[in-house]
Every structure is written in structure tokens, then in C-alpha cells.
């Protein structure tokens, strides 16, 4: 499935960059609260990743990177989640997702399910390698695939719909 979509590459000197990043940080405050109503909803659906993927693909890697770096920290400070010990790994994984999504959209200038699948797989691989470097293990990355596959599908389909229709 290919869609004609408006994709942007916003720069750091544009107010829109920070406006959209702030909107995505707020979304990343609200969405996890909804998913945490479902038992293990945060682990299964990884709601922060959905917002970062859609935001970075639609508005560029800079918007995605700002939101990826700010969202886990703001969430932790306001809600206590994610736990402090997983904050560095989660932030790294979200940053890899933002960079991969933004650069892919910038290069291909279109949104397809196949491209989004590739983005998620590359981001999971680089995030897993980062987790290995930071913690010495890749348990959470393996969990992302074994428990979190519904969330990976939601990210791909959700980002596709956001990028295509918004």
C-alpha cells in the first residue's frame, strides 16, 4: 500500500519544530495512561514508540528526536514511569526510532507499509544493540518481539494512517 502524503522535514530554527515536538510529548503523557489501563498494556503496545514513529516520519527526524529525548524524561518526572533504571535504554531506543523514521521519510519522500515495517525492524535492531551496549543484555528487545508484537503492528498501522491522513 502506497499513499500520497505530505511529509515534512522541519529544522531546529523553525518554531513549528518545537510546537510539534511539544504536542508529541503531551501525546506521550496521555497515551501511556490509556494503555496502562490494559494489563501489561505498556509492555505490549509501547505507546511512546507509536507517537515517535508517526511524528518523526511525518515531521522529520529533528521533531522526532526532540520528542524521543524529552518524552521518557517528562513522563518519568510527572508519573514515575518509565522506571529510572530503564530510562537510558528507552530513550536510546526512541531516539533510534526517530532517526530511522525521519531519515527514511526524508530519503523516500513517501509513506508505505513496507517502509514503516523496515523502519521498525531497523530501529528495533539498533535499539537492541544499544541496549546490549548499555546493559549487557537484550532481554527487553526480545520481549518487544515476543510480548510486544501487537504493539509493533499498531505502530506500523497507526503511523501509516497518521502520515497518510493527517
Segments from the language model and where they lie:
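Hydrophobic alpha-helical segments within and immediately flanking transmembrane helices
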Residues: 50-51, 71-75, 94-101
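Aromatic-anchored segments of alpha-helical transmembrane domains
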Residues: 25-34, 70-80, 120-129
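Hydrophobic transmembrane alpha-helices
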Residues: 2-55, 62-63
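Membrane-helix interface segments
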Residues: 17, 61-65, 107-113
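Helix-capping/transition residues at the boundaries of transmembrane alpha-helices
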Residues: 55-56, 105
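Short hydrophobic alpha-helical segments that form membrane-spanning helices or hydrophobic packing faces
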Residues: 65-70, 158
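Membrane-interface helix-boundary motifs at transmembrane edges
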Residues: 8-13, 103-112
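Membrane-embedded alpha-helical hairpins and interfacial helices in multi-pass inner-membrane proteins
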Residues: 37-42, 81-91, 96, 106-166
Amino acid at each position: 500500500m502506497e499513499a500520497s502524503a505530505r511529509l515534512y522535514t522541519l529544522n531546529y530554527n523553525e518554531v513549528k519544530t518545537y510546537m510539534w515536538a511539544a504536542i508529541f510529548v503531551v501525546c506521550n503523557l496521555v497515551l501511556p495512561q490509556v494503555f496502562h489501563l490494559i494489563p501489561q498494556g505498556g509492555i505490549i503496545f509501547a505507546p511512546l514508540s507509536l507517537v515517535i514513529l508517526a511524528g518523526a516520519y511525518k515531521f522529520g527526524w529533528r521533531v522526532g528526536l526532540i520528542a524521543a529525548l524529552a518524552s521518557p524524561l517528562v513522563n518519568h518526572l510527572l508519573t514515575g514511569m518509565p522506571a529510572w533504571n530503564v530510562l537510558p535504554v528507552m530513550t536510546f531506543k526512541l531516539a533510534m526510532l526517530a532517526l530511522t523514521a525521519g531519515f527514511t521519510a526524508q530519503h523516500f519522500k513517501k509513506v508505505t507499509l513496507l517502509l514503516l515495517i523496515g523502519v521498525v525492524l531497523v530501529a528495533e535492531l539498533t535499539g537492541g544493540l544499544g541496549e546490549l551496549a548499555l546493559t549487557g543484555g537484550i532481554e527487553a528487545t526480545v520481549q518487544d518481539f515476543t510480548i510486544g508484537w501487537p504493539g509493533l503492528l499498531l505502530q506500523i498501522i497507526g503511523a501509516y494512517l497518521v502520515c497518510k491522513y493527517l
